[in-house]
Amino acid sequence: MSRKIDLLDRRRARVRRAIRAAANGRPRLSVFRSSKQIYVQVIDDANGRTLAAASSLDKDLRARLKTGADKAAAAEVGKLVAERAKAAGVTKVIFDRSGYLYHGRVKALADAAREGGLDF
């Protein structure tokens, strides 16, 4: 199990290094997924502040979702974070997949955030 975690940490560091080089002052849309939930934040790394956040544990989503661990839940979270980021005045972000493969829940969240008005 520790080999899997080591590989994830290496991928995560590689992705973050590439993001830092390409960011040009844009906030980072950071994704964390667990086996049961999905979380996303829009982070301003220059000031060290979280500008917007959403997760499958939010009260308004929790009543509508059957589970927080499927693509439908990820899409709802993506729409919600896009809505909150636009309310905070953010439209251009850089996508931080945190070492996860761009597939399944991560891809569904990214597509929904794009549809919601975020540009990345």
Swiss-Prot record:
GO molecular function, one term: structural constituent of ribosome
Domain of life from the UniProt record: Bacteria
Gene3D superfamilies, sorted: 3.30.420.100
InterPro entries: Ribosomal_uL18_bac-type, Ribosomal_uL18_bac/euk
The UniProt record lists the keyword Ribosomal protein: yes
BP GO annotations: translation
Record has RNA-binding as a keyword: yes
This protein's UniProt keywords: Ribonucleoprotein, Ribosomal protein, RNA-binding, rRNA-binding
Pfam families for the chain: Ribosomal_L18p
GO CC terms, sorted: cytosolic large ribosomal subunit
HAMAP family: Ribosomal_uL18_B
Protein family according to the UniProt entry: Belongs to the universal ribosomal protein uL18 family.
Known function: This is one of the proteins that bind and probably mediate the attachment of the 5S RNA into the large ribosomal subunit, where it forms part of the central protuberance.
Subunit structure, as described in the record: Part of the 50S ribosomal subunit; part of the 5S rRNA/L5/L18/L25 subcomplex. Contacts the 5S and 23S rRNAs.
NCBIfam families per UniProt: L18_bact
Protein name per its UniProtKB record: Large ribosomal subunit protein uL18
Natural source organism: Methylobacterium nodulans (strain LMG 21967 / CNCM I-2342 / ORS 2060)
Gene responsible for this protein: rplR
